[in-house]
Amino acid sequence: MTPTAVPATPTEIPATPTPTETPATPTATPVPEVDWYQAMLDRSVMYKGNNARLKKVIEKARSGETVNIATLGGSITEGANATPWTLGYAYRFAEKFAAEYGVNGGENINYANAGIGGTPSALGVIRYERDVVEALGAEPDLFVIEFEVNDYAEATKGRAYESLVYQVLSQSNDAAVIMVFAVRSDMWNVQDEHYPIAIRYGIPVVAIKNAVEPAIAEGQLDKNVFFSDEYHPTNYGHDIMSDCIMQMVRVLDTAEADEMKPLAEKAIKGRNFVGTKMIDSATEGIAIEAGAFTKVDGEIQRFSTKMLPSFPNNWMHDGAAGNDSFKMTLNCKNLLMNYKTGSGAFGTAEVYVDGKLVKDLNGAGGWNNSNVVLLIDEKEAAEHVVEIRMAEGQEDKAFTIYAFGYTE
């Protein structure tokens, strides 16, 4: 497998244990030969969907053609609490896929991990072009999407998620999509919200809750062995997740081929955010007056996988430059804004659209993490003026605008 802009193959590969019928231990490695383990993998295959696209990807891989795989999601996809991160489920899946279906050790498989902790699909749709297509140098052939524990109260109410799925399926390369429904340790996620989207487009669904909840309840799998905290798997849990995705791939690989079907004409949530474009301070051709937001914030959220800043071309008000407004004039239908919540002296900014106050955004109380809000949501494109300034009494506080995402 050829990673794209990611570290080299991990050096800590878990040893294969002797199969056992006893529950897992903290040092255990997944053992597919054991009945309860295989039953868990079988349960993870929530919905097989239409297999035509995935079969095409598998055939490309086997024939030696280049196959580009991308994963997009939150911290679980990023590899949080896997040590090292290359033992996270996303990288492990790409590794296993490359070994099983690629040629010459998977040299024809390229992979990009676009997970960022604490982020919803509304930020994913902003980042797709940069962090998936540009990172790979091509559109993905296989796209794995995971936002199940991050999309609670998501700004677009599911439309960004469906837009991402539809955008990938609409590519000229007949790309395949796999939805991964991760789960918190309390067995909560938003899979009931996203599952209808899978049905509408015939997308395979791997449901981790369906897999592990019965195993935990029956004492076959220790919850504290699978989960490292409330949200994130251990190395062992990440490897189980990767095995669940591989189970889906193997099931569809051996199934009778489906006929490729045209994309559904009617959306479930909405496709308003297909083709979303990112705006940051390096973007040209957008009318922006930075006002007092002229600094660059260096204390920002990073990609754990690459240790690179997630939004380096930001606009920061540092509390010492006055209170001149940030102004942007833009022709758009939809506009998303991504701002930072940080520790220390961060304050509240007011956001105006066409002179009307639409948001009060508190930039304090976070860990440099991203927060996405929807500022404009229209059916037709029109010229809008967006103005951002510190709230009264907050002029000496800091506030950082990470980026915007818009549709034309």
Name every feature range the model reports, one short phrase each.
Residues 254-329, 338:
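Glycan-recognition and processing domains
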Residues 332:
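Contiguous, non-catalytic segments that form substrate-binding/exosite surfaces or channel walls
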Residues 395-408:
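Extended, polar beta-sheet/loop recognition surfaces of beta-rich domains
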